[in-house]
Amino acid sequence: LKKLENDEFFVHFSFDKNVFLSFDEAFILLQNNRVIGGGKVLNPLSEPLKKEQKNKFLMFLKNKDFKAAFSFLKDAHKYGFGLLSSYQRFKLSHQKALKLAKELNQVFVDEKNLNVYHLQSLEEIKNFIKFILEKNPYAMLSAHSLALRITWASENFCELGLKKMSNLLDFQNGIYFKKGIDFEKLQEKNNNQMYEILKKQGIKPEAPYNLYDFLELDRKSGDNILKKLTQKGLVVRLSHNLFIEKQALEKLMQECLNLLKNQSLDVQSMKEYFNLSRKYAIAYLEYLDKFPQVNKEAEKRFLTNI
């Protein structure tokens, strides 16, 4: 990569197999069992950097100027860099690495998740929040829901982004929502929308998390909405992630009972007759088992003589 003074070089090694190395670890090079060179590891992890940048970073490491190295990584990694492997990379404990990171300018240090973010990247989170609100003014947001969608951002960094938008957002019951919207009406509207979607989807409802994403709901709010709809008897929960509108379920069960007058039902026949996935077919058959006139033999269902 670069020739230094005293016959030293920065060298990049490529290996056929994964090799665990750590900062400042000594090594020797052998050829035909003879030593032809040696040195110390500076950067044990591969960094997607151009040659000039890589040489600059390696010089910081060679001089053990870790503050400069951290500052370099902060600028080089748009979406933050981690300190989880700080001992392997710099021979620094987590505590020392965090302390050093806090001395940098324009950074947010997530101590819990051991991440360091340039504050400039906060704008991307804020822009994403604005995009959500433009698409759906009735969105219910949380740091947790944002972190699930912004894969590079930790929950704590997303929380900072939400707090920085107090001019656009109100906060109540752990939920951020568009300023000026009544929270009770917001909940009611999302309840109604969730029910209408499930009603429209019939016997093939989407998984809850997909519905939450569509309505821009954080998972806690979405779970609460489904819980309320279930308590009101409008929706029936058949499994961990299968909620079906009650009337659609009742209609399906009636169709199944009518079919049982002339044939048996099993997973395969349910899949074929109703065009269902195996998961849905099993859930509906298990619900059908609750009917007293249905008898299960092996994996087939029959009508009893009662």
Regions found by a protein language model. Give the residues of each.
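Charged, often glycine-enriched C-terminal and inter-domain segments
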Residues: 1-30, 36-45, 49, 220
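C-terminal non-catalytic scaffold/interaction domains in large multidomain proteins
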Residues: 20, 35-306
